[in-house]
């Protein structure tokens, strides 16, 4: 029998979250971000489920975009990090990918090539993130350069990225919004504008513009500090489930796991769970990290190992070998788990390893003990 670790993924919840996002930004089109293997949920599976419901898909590399074309995805795809070398411009031209231009070298590559078809271009501004994008003071010149290029389809689109939208109290948010608005008011183009990520969708309706670019919210995790996914009416797409493979009666003072970090404070039942950091569970998880056994809240004890973790079964005295264990997802918000680690929900979702089986279903049902 194979390992029982499985990621149960809900199409219903994915589409529910998209509906919530559309209700928050009713005048905007949606670029669904499926980069990084759709935040760990499966690039192909997520994209095929979203294709009929969104306007574009967003990826980080041309390799991801080509995978989507290979499986028959026909809607526009945007390369959010642009191209990494000159020949990728030729591929983007042929395949009809939208390309983000954020670096002067990319414009030089463009000038030295003869693309088969005009490229749909997005100029990226660094409005305060300090990452990719042209500085605001120099961006008008690069915008004009793209506008005059015969290899670029007109009009030129413009985007930027909010650095602190998850924290509504941070003054940088309004500074970035003002900088972005100032730039687009100064150009005469008729292209589309995009500024908001998931957090921006919920926090800054005045900045929604033509396109919003939700990522983590699509997958049912909260993008906002201090607010749960449930408060935002988001539902987890992934429920990570496994099972108990051993139950031990431990005497008071018995150490558990590598480094003997945890010493049993009393005689207790401890369950061994078939999941570890080799599957994607965070090695930094502390004692007390919540885990559901038979839908009962229990606590992690001892250090996470590659293939196993241990759990205090005191709240679940009738647990037996084979009983289901939920590590995050349905009834156990991933943000709550992340709070006991040195990670955030993004890390946990995108870190699930390929030895975990993925099973898509319309309705999540974790009450059965079958895999």
Per-region residue spans from a language model:
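Active-site-proximal beta-alpha core segment in soluble small-molecule metabolic enzymes
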Residues: 5-9, 13-16, 23-194, 208
